[in-house]
Amino acid sequence: MLLCVSADLAQAQGLDVIHCTDSTFCVPSVWGMPRSKALIFEYENVFSHRLRATSDLEAVGNGSGELQREERLDFKLRFPIYLSESFKMALGFSYFNEDYIFKDFDNPDYALFQSLDDKNLKSMGMALYLTKAWKGKHYFIMRISTDLNGDYKAGVLPRDRYLRVSIAPMFGVKKDAWTSYGGGIAWGYNFGRPTIYPFFVYNRTFNDKLGIESILPANAMLRVNFSQSMILYSGVALEGSSYTIRPSGEALAQFETLQLRKSEIRLFANLEREIHDWFWFNVEAGVRFSYRFELAENLLYNPETIIDMRRRPAPFLKAGVFLVPPKKFLE
């Protein structure tokens, strides 16, 4: 799950609104950042690439083959539940579906192939977003999320072994209308395994066309504002997740459940275009580099792997639509 602690929950665009003074409450976003997304629907396809799997377990062994494609469907909804000048609270819901399609495996009975091929991996989650602003230049943002990640079937209530919890609190400083920075400590799955790590946020707008937005080590992006209705992002992102799956085949029969841990680095370009005020679409393309892709015993923290996989870089294409607050709501 990607670290997300960005921006105010109802971002404004005018300099008179987002400039922080000693007598006004700080707004974390900087000039040029787009309105926050209230609803997102995206489809992604990672194209064919080779994969090699190794295991120290003699019963599992090694294998290689081709991942014909990875299909991903993503739905997110976020809405405010409390708004005031100094404190904002929002609630978010998400659904994510990921499907791996293998072909040309050197051993069709290989444990990895049996456990992952054409098996829908789902993530259903809920997140709470808190933003506290003080008069002047300081603010606090926190995101708490819980997700149920795994290969559970629709209509079946998942057990607690599918539960994933992430938290990311941060303090920030709004230097002026063009610059905002801050930092915090996160607990999450950006590296595939559950990890506690520091992060740093830096947002800067240089002029009416160019800016940067970054949450290190999660992402760093260059923003090009062609107009108020078209924005181009390009940069690098670190994405990760963890799924609980039920193993298939005799080689892994000793394990009740396994944990698929994945983390990847992405180089991308993303174009966002307004269709009508609150209705936008986006198209994203890039290259995915696998950092971690492994099966391990389903424990909270377990550095040992059962199957370690190496994937070659692969191109990906993503398209979607999203809704933002109408401009009149921010006036």
Regions found by a protein language model. Give the residues of each.
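Residue-level signature of outer-membrane beta-barrel architecture
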Residues: 77-81, 128, 132, 173, ...
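Surface-exposed strand-loop-strand hairpins of Gram-negative outer-membrane beta-barrel proteins
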Residues: 46-72, 111-116, 306
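Outer-membrane beta-barrel "beta-signal"
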Residues: 200-203, 271, 310-331
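Sec-dependent signal peptide cleavage junction
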Residues: 8-47, 51-58, 327-331
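Transmembrane beta-strands of outer-membrane beta-barrel pores
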Residues: 43-49, 93-101, 146-152, 185-191, ...
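Outer-membrane beta-barrel translocator/channel fold
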Residues: 50-57, 107-108, 216-317
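Residues that define the transmembrane beta-barrel architecture of outer-membrane proteins
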Residues: 67-73, 118-124, 159-165, 194-198, ...
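Outer-envelope beta-barrel architecture signal
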Residues: 33-39, 85-91, 136-142, 177-181, ...
